[in-house]
């Protein structure tokens, strides 16, 4: 939905980015009569590869089983006993399988629109927070001004760039063990985790709850994880560590998805090993989508936006707020992103109410 107001009128709130954080921020801002304008991202090959298409990274996830309110399993038994007369009315279309990522994101998007959110399917390429109202420059050209801004551009998982990795994304290849590890396809199956830092060890340890065994693949001869985390992996009987190995290829077929991996030695040229696996989890870090800010906000050493107040979404510039994975390098869950989206809208509303902007 394009903005029909004068280009000279400053928007009250502009939200940059979509996903759970952006749509939650939009819903709360719209309900507060702030008339939010959302730049949900452009539909482009660049954004597809980065996982920053409209609707956010969750739109690339086939199944979501851990978002509150969308249970997997048989809801019929509960509804028959609790609300037998209303069973048909209450039964959701996603009954029995949780909800897909695109389905959840489209529902959140539509909810925001229902309350009056306006949407532009484009990227913001650069910003100027040095003057008020703030200046935002869309990729399609022109200039938008805003009294308050919420940045919800997320963080993109790092990938190896293998063609086979791309082929089997959401068919056994994932970048989030907590999101996908409990899916039925991975239960009691051998799984592979690629990486050697704390995140990789945490994901490998988490997956031992579901997998028959976990193969932790690291290209060096020692783990980069902290000593206590590394020792935990070494001592775990369900984790096998493959040192000095790099993922060369994800193996599989159209019918079954991932069936294994081919590893290549980093110390012995030409030496390869095949490992059977039903899933491959990349744990080689994330890159927050903050490059377009170009020094306008304070960032951490890892380029995440800094929240300047405890349990608030304020950034280093008053009137600019951050929500979701663009500022969170710890939890990185859809539901926590949605929570900070809500917080950012409330923070923006209160800031604006005190005659700022």
Descriptions of predicted regions:
Residues 10-11, 145-147, 188, 277, ...:
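Active-site acidic short loop of glycosyltransferases
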């Amino acid at each position: 939905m394009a903005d029909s107001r004068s280009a000279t009128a400053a928007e009250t709130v502009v939200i940059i980015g979509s996903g759970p954080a952006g749509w939650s921020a939009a819903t709360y801002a719209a309900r507060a009569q702030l008339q939010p304008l959302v730049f949900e991202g452009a539909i482009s090959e660049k954004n597809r590869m980065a996982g920053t298409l409209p609707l956010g990274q969750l739109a690339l996830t086939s199944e979501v089983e851990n978002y509150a309110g969308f249970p997997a399993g048989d809801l019929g038994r509960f509804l028959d006993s609790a609300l037998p007369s209303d069973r048909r009315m209450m039964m959701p279309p996603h009954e029995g399988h949780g909800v897909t990522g695109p389905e959840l994101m489209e529902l959140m998007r539509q909810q925001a629109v229902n309350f009056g959110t306006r949407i532009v399917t484009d990227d913001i390429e650069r910003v100027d927070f040095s003057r008020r109202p703030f200046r935002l420059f869309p990729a399609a050209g022109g200039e938008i001004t805003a009294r308050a801004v919420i940045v919800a551009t997320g963080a993109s998982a790092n990938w190896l760039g293998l063609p086979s990795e791309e082929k089997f994304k959401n068919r056994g290849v994932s970048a989030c063990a907590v999101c996908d590890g409990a899916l039925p396809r991975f239960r009691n199956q051998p799984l592979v985790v690629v990486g050697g830092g704390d995140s990789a060890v945490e994901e490998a340890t988490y997956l031992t709850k579901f997998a028959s065994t976990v193969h932790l693949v690291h290209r060096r001869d020692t783990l980069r994880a902290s000593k206590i985390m590394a020792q935990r992996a070494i001592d775990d009987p369900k984790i096998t560590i493959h040192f000095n190995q790099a993922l060369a290829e994800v193996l599989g077929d159209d019918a079954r998805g991932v069936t294994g991996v081919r590893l290549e030695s980093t110390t012995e040229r030409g030496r390869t090993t095949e490992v059977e696996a039903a899933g491959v989890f990349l744990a080689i870090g994330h890159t927050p989508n903050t490059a377009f800010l170009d020094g306008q906000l304070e960032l951490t050493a890892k380029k995440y936006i800094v929240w300047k107040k405890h349990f608030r979404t304020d950034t280093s510039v008053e009137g600019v707020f951050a929500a979701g994975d663009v500022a969170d390098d710890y939890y990185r869950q859809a539901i926590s992103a949605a929570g900070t989206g809500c917080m950012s809208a409330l923070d923006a509303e209160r800031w604006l109410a005190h005659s700022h902007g």
